[in-house]
């Protein structure tokens, strides 16, 4: 079992506060996770008082998923006394490596993380005192480059998000089983469904007013979920996801975790070549630091060609998904299943829809 980033940030913050109140850093701290309603004890790597007014403590992330990119990343918490007359009791800030919301400028420290920090720090903060807490992720900016955070408005680092303290391993068979169970229940009610790739997919489905009863959340196991949809006799299936994730399917990659396969740059370059872009532009796409940067470059340089490229990618996703189902299901299972896709961009607006995707979207809106 592992924990989410907010839990480790809270452990470091509590340890730093106890440095100030007790004069020494504890080797471990016990936290109330809130969700679930239980306490857990976590180790503290290092900690010390910097002076009488401030302290620093460090933990290391230990999520349950061995492929989680935050595994073993250090989390620092810098805690200092504040004037209790003018300052809030507990002030929480994001330091280096903690992302910020591009739209608001606020640190990407969300509700559960703030509640977890506040609840546990109040247990150790003297009644007459106030503290400021800054969470620092020294590797946060580098790690964020390997995520799609920037595409969804979170820049300069990682988010402290989640709704629970327990990390759900992305590769756990039991989690895939839960997705399959949800798929089975919804397939029994409707033959036209939407695979929403991650939380962003669910949000876009809501924007499109797709009924929740038609939406099935998926993570990285698109291959097994496609096969399951065929076995549950789904007739129409829309893949709704961020283009930087679904593009992998165009190359036949059906487990999309970045640690297992991250050929997005190569795939995009190949489709640019098929669209007839010259060698210099292909080099620019190939050498872009991220796929998002490459797409921005194309948007700027060849805005008239980019829709064609994305349309070809969407069409190829349909082809490869259909071929995957046929390869993994004995006939006649899945032969009548129509797969389409809709890709959205960083602004959560649809940027490309395959022909089958358009048909399925119309079907859903009619019903």
From Swiss-Prot:
Q: Which domain of life is it from?
A: Bacteria
Task: Identify which top EC class this enzyme belongs to.
Answer: transferase
Q: Quick check: keyword Signal in the entry?
A: no
In which pathway is this protein known to take part? Cofactor biosynthesis; adenosylcobalamin biosynthesis; cob(II)yrinate a,c-diamide from sirohydrochlorin (anaerobic route): step 6/10
Which residues belong to the signal peptide in this entry? none
UniProt-listed Pfam families: CbiD
Q: What is its EC number?
A: 2.1.1.195
Q: Which reaction does it catalyse?
A: Co-precorrin-5B + S-adenosyl-L-methionine = Co-precorrin-6A + S-adenosyl-L-homocysteine
Classification via NCBIfam families: cbiD (TIGR00312)
This chain belongs to the protein called: Cobalt-precorrin-5B C(1)-methyltransferase
Q: Which species does the entry assign this protein to?
A: Thermosynechococcus vestitus (strain NIES-2133 / IAM M-273 / BP-1)
């Amino acid at each position: 079992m592992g924990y989410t980033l907010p839990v480790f940030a809270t452990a470091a913050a509590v340890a730093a506060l106890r440095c100030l109140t007790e004069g020494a850093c504890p080797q471990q701290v016990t936290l109330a996770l809130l969700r679930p309603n239980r306490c857990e004890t976590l180790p503290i790597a290092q900690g010390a008082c910097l002076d009488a007014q401030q302290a620093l403590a460090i933990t290391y992330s230990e999520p349950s998923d061995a492929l989680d990119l935050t595994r073993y990343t250090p989390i620092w918490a810098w805690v200092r006394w504040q004037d209790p007359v003018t300052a809030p009791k507990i002030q929480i800030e994001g330091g280096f490596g903690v992302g910020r919301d591009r739209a608001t400028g606020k640190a990407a420290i969300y509700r559960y993380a703030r509640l977890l920090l506040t609840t546990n720090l109040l247990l150790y903060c003297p009644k007459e005192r106030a503290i400021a807490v800054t969470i620092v992720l020294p590797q946060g900016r580098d790690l964020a480059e390997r995520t799609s955070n920037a595409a969804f408005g979170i820049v300069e680092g990682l988010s402290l998000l989640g709704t629970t303290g327990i990390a759900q391993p992305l590769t756990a068979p039991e989690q895939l089983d839960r997705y399959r169970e949800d798929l089975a229940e919804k397939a029994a009610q409707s033959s036209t469904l939407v695979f929403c790739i991650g939380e962003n997919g669910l949000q876009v489905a809501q924007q499109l007013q797709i009924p929740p009863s038609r939406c099935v959340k998926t993570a990285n196991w698109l291959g097994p979920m496609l096969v399951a949809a065929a076995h549950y006799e789904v007739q129409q299936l829309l893949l709704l996801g961020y283009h930087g994730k679904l593009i992998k399917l165009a190359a036949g990659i059906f487990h999309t975790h970045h640690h297992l396969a991250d050929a997005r740059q190569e795939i995009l370059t190949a489709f640019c070549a098929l669209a007839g872009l010259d060698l210099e532009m292909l080099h620019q796409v190939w050498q872009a630091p991220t796929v998002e940067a490459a797409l921005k470059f194309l948007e700027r340089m060849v805005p008239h060609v980019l829709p064609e490229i994305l349309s070809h990618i969407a069409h190829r996703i349909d082809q490869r998904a259909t071929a995957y189902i046929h390869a993994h299901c004995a006939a006649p299972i899945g032969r009548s299943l129509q797969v389409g896709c809709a890709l959205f961009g960083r602004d959560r607006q649809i940027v490309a829809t395959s022909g089958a995707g358009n048909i399925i979207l119309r079907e859903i809106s009619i019903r």
